[in-house]
Amino acid sequence: MTRGVPRLAVAARHFSTAEAAGVKVAAQDGQSPISDLSVVLRGGSRYATVPGVSHILEKFAFQNTVPKSALRFVRELELFGGKLYTHTTREHIVLRTQFLKQDLPYFVDAFANVLKETKFQQFELTERVAPVAELDLLKRESDPAFTALEAAHEVAFRTGLGNSVYAQGYSPVTLEDVKEFARQVYAKQNVAVVGNNVVPADLQQLVGTAFADLQEGSKVTQAGTTTLHGGEARVRTSTGNALTIALPIAEPKPVYHALASFLGGPASMPWSVGASPLAQATVGTHTSVKATYHNYGDAGLFAITIKGDSPAEISQVAHKAVQALKDTGAEVTEEQAARAYAKSKFAAAEAFENPDSSASVIGMELLSGVSRIAPENVQKFTPAELSEAAAQLSASAKPVVAAVGQVHALPFADELF
């Protein structure tokens, strides 16, 4: 309860947005000596022309370009004291770097060279890019919860959003595949530049110069429309056990963010089980559980993922989780609704404060024109609205269940619904 606790007015952080030479730019200044710069590309796995090509294209970033070799870039990066990160999502490829504030011109130029003048050489694909992509996949597949959520996406959407984020060995990506995809993605229509702790006017001027001769291109689109499906996936592995219960959503709504926050999962304090319905479902077990909502604009996926060593305990928690969703559809109290709102607001603010996640969020908004997670846009829903959303999900005609690990001992969909 927060009755009687004073609250202070908090100033919202704002990014100034503009277009520079046809490229969308968002930036905000700050007092830190470290700047953060990201290039967000509309080219995630949902747009992949062949399986895994988005992941491979991401790993080609900062390989040999016409102006300089990969080795030269590495040496220069170390001289400047900067750091480089890249990752791929279902919707975007993100190239991100951190550096001392005065070195902004160098890194804007480096990003522009990646998009305009990467050589895409066969030996790089064979000796550098493909092995790194394989290690990336192996690292993620060591987590059964990741594998379960990936499998749930594949069942729910099949193609497009159902495409694997990571390149898979069974479907090799050729150099021509990468070149063709790069020609589509590396275009002004698919690029957003996001700067944290940079002077907005400086970034806009530098982008306007460095990206001026980047091809105009056209918006990358998904092949075919997004369709929703129900079903099951059973993945036998020895890396651990996990179960994802997923419910595809045809019309994404902000209320599902609040519902995921309400159902919860991980405790807010390390020595506490937590008071959320899903946290209570794990009492007496050695399992972890979390509700997540994945909003992709044209569709969504509400997921509850359970992980643990014991298949019997996972099965027990899964039944309780489904019941918790049904119970939420029956009744939500005012206090529970207030708790869901506070957690949603905090999660959105936390994402905005983290330079990595904020770059993805802001870049996504620049490219799509739709705000999905800004803290000031988080709505406060009534208990009735939360109950209605939960009731609609629990009555879904297309539930998805993805089991990973000792699948012979994990529940099937018809045992849960």
From Swiss-Prot:
Protein purpose: Component of the ubiquinol-cytochrome c oxidoreductase, a multisubunit transmembrane complex that is part of the mitochondrial electron transport chain which drives oxidative phosphorylation.
Signal peptide: none
Keywords, alphabetical: Electron transport, Membrane, Mitochondrion, Mitochondrion inner membrane, Respiratory chain, Transit peptide, Transport
Similarity remark: Belongs to the peptidase M16 family. UQCRC2/QCR2 subfamily.
PANTHER family: CYTOCHROME B-C1 COMPLEX SUBUNIT 2, MITOCHONDRIAL, METALLOPROTEASE
UniProt-annotated location(s): Mitochondrion inner membrane
One Pfam short name: Peptidase_M16
GO MF terms held by the record: metal ion binding; metalloendopeptidase activity; ubiquinol-cytochrome-c reductase activity
Origin species: Yarrowia lipolytica (strain CLIB 122 / E 150) (Yeast)
Transit peptide: 1-22
Gene Ontology BP annotations: mitochondrial electron transport, ubiquinol to cytochrome c; proteolysis
InterPro entries: Metalloenz_LuxS/M16, MPP/UQCRC_Complex, Pept_M16_N, Pept_M16_Zn_BS, Peptidase_M16_C
Self-association state and partner proteins as the record states: Component of the ubiquinol-cytochrome c oxidoreductase (cytochrome b-c1 complex, complex III, CIII), a multisubunit enzyme composed of 3 respiratory subunits cytochrome b, cytochrome c1 and Rieske protein, 2 core protein subunits, and additional low-molecular weight protein subunits. The complex exists as an obligatory dimer and forms supercomplexes (SCs) in the inner mitochondrial membrane with cytochrome c oxidase (complex IV, CIV).
Name of the protein in question: Cytochrome b-c1 complex subunit 2, mitochondrial
Record keyword Manganese present: no
Recorded topology in the membrane: Peripheral membrane protein
One GO cellular component term noted in the UniProt record for this chain: respiratory chain complex III
